[in-house]
């Protein structure tokens, strides 16, 4: 699918990777999970991102995952492949492999983690990746995980590259507003923060790359529809009920909470791979009560004063 198909996507789900108890990928679980997403307003799917536990996946496993999901999706929604690493050469080799593999509207490349490059180093990293193949690139800017932040000024330099088509922005709403105001017209801006989706869409973002859409896609769609129809009272009411659910989804290192909920719902999401571990049983029960049932008492116990463990 093309850029134009991607431009129509408001809710892009950052898909989990289902695992067996022995840690191998559970390919048999994928069809039911995909159909669930598509039935609940997922417009596009990101594979091999943070929520997929990509640091624990080999490139060969990622390619197997890509093939399995493409077979199920069968062109119904655009797909994005996670292609970035903190090694520019490895990223180039993999983006070329994914481009040859085919079937993706874009590749998502994360800001290099651990190395702590300068702004010029980050600029050259993404420019070199974007120069390497015809696969359009979306930058993933998430300083809470990678320590360094790609500034809006550097992002706008990269936005002029013809093969860099957008950003998944996980910094501040102020940065997002600045980017939306100054970006090239066709440059796509997604928030990667479910809790900020309401504000981002009102600022003029193109959509959200989401974890919560695994479990709460219907209310996200309803909120976005209300925003599009200028029914801000309705949209804000949905957001007020949505925020505690998002907080619960990130009250333990992600994707452990969303996997606990999906397992509860009858899907074979399975465990996380080490070094991530499942949420403790009592915490998982509270998370499920918040996200699935909207239980106020569980909300207070689960999210009051919680600091996101990935930030």
UniProtKB/Swiss-Prot annotation:
Enzyme class name: lyase
Q: In which pathway does it act?
A: Amino-acid biosynthesis; L-lysine biosynthesis via DAP pathway; (S)-tetrahydrodipicolinate from L-aspartate: step 3/4
Query: From which domain of life does this come?
Result: Bacteria
**Record's keyword annotation contains Cytoplasm:** yes
The protein's location, in the record's own words, is: Cytoplasm
Q: Which residues form a coiled coil?
A: none
Q: Which residues form the active site?
A: 140 (proton donor/acceptor), 168 (schiff-base intermediate with substrate)
* UniProt keywords, alphabetically: Amino-acid biosynthesis, Cytoplasm, Diaminopimelate biosynthesis, Lyase, Lysine biosynthesis, Schiff base
Annotated site residues (Part of a proton relay during catalysis) in this chain: 50, 114
One BP term from GO: diaminopimelate biosynthetic process
> What name is this protein filed under?
4-hydroxy-tetrahydrodipicolinate synthase
Species of origin reads Streptococcus pneumoniae (strain 70585)
């Amino acid at each position: 699918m093309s850029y134009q198909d991607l431009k129509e996507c408001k809710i892009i789900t950052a898909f989990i990777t289902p695992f067996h108890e022995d840690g191998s990928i559970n390919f048999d679980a994928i069809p039911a999970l995909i159909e669930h997403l598509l039935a609940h307003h997922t417009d596009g799917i990101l594979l091999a991102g943070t929520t997929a536990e990509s640091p624990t996946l080999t490139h060969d496993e990622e390619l197997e995952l890509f093939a399995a999901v493409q077979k199920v999706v069968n062109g119904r929604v655009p797909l994005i492949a996670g292609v970035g690493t903190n090694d520019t050469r490895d990223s180039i080799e993999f983006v070329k492999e994914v481009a040859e593999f085919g079937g993706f509207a874009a590749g998502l490349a994360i800001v290099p983690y651990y190395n702590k490059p300068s702004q010029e180093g980050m600029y050259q990293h993404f420019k070199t990746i974007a120069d390497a193949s015809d696969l359009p690139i979306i930058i993933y800017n998430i300083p809470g995980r990678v320590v360094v932040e790609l500034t809006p000024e550097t992002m706008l330099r990269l936005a002029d590259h013809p093969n860099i088509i957008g950003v998944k922005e996980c910094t501040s709403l102020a940065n997002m507003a600045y980017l939306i105001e100054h970006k090239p017209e066709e440059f796509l801006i997604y928030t990667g923060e479910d809790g900020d989706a309401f504000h981002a869409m009102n600022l003029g973002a193109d959509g959200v790359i989401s974890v919560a859409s695994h479990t709460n896609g219907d209310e996200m769609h309803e909120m976005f529809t209300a925003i599009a129809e200028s029914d801000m009272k309705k949209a804000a009411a949905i957001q007020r009920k949505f925020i505690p659910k998002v907080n619960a989804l990130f009250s333990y290192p992600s994707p452990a909470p969303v996997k606990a909920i999906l397992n509860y719902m009858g899907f074979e999401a399975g465990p996380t791979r080490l070094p991530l571990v499942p949420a403790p049983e009592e915490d998982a029960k509270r998370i499920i009560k918040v996200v699935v049932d909207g239980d106020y008492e569980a909300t207070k116990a689960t999210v009051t004063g919680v600091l996101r463990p990935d930030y």
